[in-house]
């Protein structure tokens, strides 16, 4: 393998949603260079950051039935029992909820935590308070999705944050998702909540780093065989 190919192999692809933003940053950088070179270099750093924000690296997802993987890169901010939002239609009993906070430095492409059918997608307008606060799950702009699996229904909620102002969904109701398949993106910092079926036991802890499509959040078949993987 040549040096150029080796370098290219280490650079993750950029998601198409980022092209307009990267282009705008690059154009602004050119203007800044014309005004004053030091400003141009600051613009260059910001353009590189923007490109990294929209990176979309390949992930190797465990695909054995019963596994729930992280839908987002970031830090596990909460592992709690919580009544799901009424919009999800998952009942009024507390369910295990895993929350993952994404900083502006994380990859923001979101991936399906399970294999299943998208039953409902509900968009809710709202505020843009700090996504790390628990009340953000009720007050902030969010996009909720319910996925049906053999083990029960999984609720996935994309929550906009203090900086994030745009939730993007790539899927539609009735669509079948593979585990780790891309389903959306949130621009510039946010949170993902995953509501597990009653009785499920989360396998992650608060403060743990999660990798979208790879980190296992729960396993409905603990002790049953090994895991197989898919790369995408």
Swiss-Prot record:
UniProt entry tagged with the keyword S-adenosyl-L-methionine: no
UniProt catalytic activity: a 1,2-diacyl-sn-glycero-3-phospho-L-serine + H(+) = a 1,2-diacyl-sn-glycero-3-phosphoethanolamine + CO2
Cofactor binding, note field: Binds 1 pyruvoyl group covalently per subunit.
GO cellular component: plasma membrane
Organism per entry: Rhodopseudomonas palustris (strain BisB5)
Presence of keyword Lipid metabolism: yes
Matches recorded under Pfam families: PS_Dcarbxylase (PF02666)
One Gene Ontology MF term: phosphatidylserine decarboxylase activity
Assembly with partners or alone: Heterodimer of a large membrane-associated beta subunit and a small pyruvoyl-containing alpha subunit.
Designated name of the protein: Phosphatidylserine decarboxylase proenzyme
HAMAP family with a match to the protein in the record: PS_decarb_PSD_A
């Amino acid at each position: 393998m040549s040096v150029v190919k080796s370098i290219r192999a280490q650079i993750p692809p950029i998601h198409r949603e980022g092209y307009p933003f990267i282009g705008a940053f690059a154009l602004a950088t050119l203007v800044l260079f014309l005004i004053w070179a030091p400003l141009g270099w600051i613009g260059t750093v910001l353009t590189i950051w923007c490109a990294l924000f929209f990176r979309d690296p390949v992930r190797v997802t465990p695909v054995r039935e019963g596994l729930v993987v992280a839908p987002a890169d970031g830090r596990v901010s909460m592992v709690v029992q919580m009544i799901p939002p009424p919009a999800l239609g998952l009942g009024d009993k507390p369910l295990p909820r895993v929350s993952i906070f994404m900083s502006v430095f994380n990859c923001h492409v979101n991936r399906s935590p399970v294999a299943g059918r998208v039953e409902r997608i509900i968009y809710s307008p709202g505020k843009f308070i700090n996504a790390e606060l628990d009340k953000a799950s009720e007050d902030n702009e969010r996009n909720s999705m319910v996925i049906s699996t053999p083990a029960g229904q999984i609720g996935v909620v994309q929550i906009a944050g203090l900086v994030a102002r745009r939730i993007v969904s790539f899927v539609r109701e009735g669509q079948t998702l593979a585990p780790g398949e891309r389903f959306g993106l949130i621009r510039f910092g946010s949170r993902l909540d995953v509501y597990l079926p009653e009785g499920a036991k989360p396998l992650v802890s608060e403060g743990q780093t999660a990798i979208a499509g790879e980190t296992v959040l729960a396993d409905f078949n603990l002790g049953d065989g090994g895991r197989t993987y898919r790369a995408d």
